[in-house]
Amino acid sequence: NEDKVQHILVQELPHSPESFIHLDMVFTFLDKDKCMVYEPLIMSPGNYQTVHIKIQHGKLISIRREKTLLHALKKLGMDLEPVYCGGEDETWNMEREQWHSGANFFCVAPGKVLGYARNNYTVEAMNNAGFEIIRANDVISNKVDLSKYEKYMITIEGSELPRGGGGARCMTMPINRDAVEW
């Protein structure tokens, strides 16, 4: 519908290191009301710009700077609670786990995500946010019935995948799934 206003949010990222190659390395949706964030970049206004662009009838309506990406999303009706990559306490843990794709989750459905087991502080933050932590090997061997859990994180073992330059979302081909109603 051409009458509908299109909203484009642009999040500036650092040019280096390569762990900031795209948005999924610092921000991913986990559920309808939760997202994984790399706090030093996503939650710190001023360091990197967030821009909100509005387009209608193929024409630019406005461009404005927003305080943060989460602030801009909230204005659009997506009030998201952040879960912090690397936990909330130590910047070193945040940096280390972001470098190891700790903010990069593959969301199969709202509240059902896959991510790396090696990011211990991130896994703990997910558990504290209400996600059941389930090992991928337990799913593969049918030791776990996923239908019994409302929210879960399936943890993927290994250190070789992050060396390939991405996380669970980066390394997943597109899938067909039902649209999420916000």
Predicted regions and their residues:
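The feature marks the mature, well-folded catalytic cores of soluble enzymes
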Residues: N1-W182
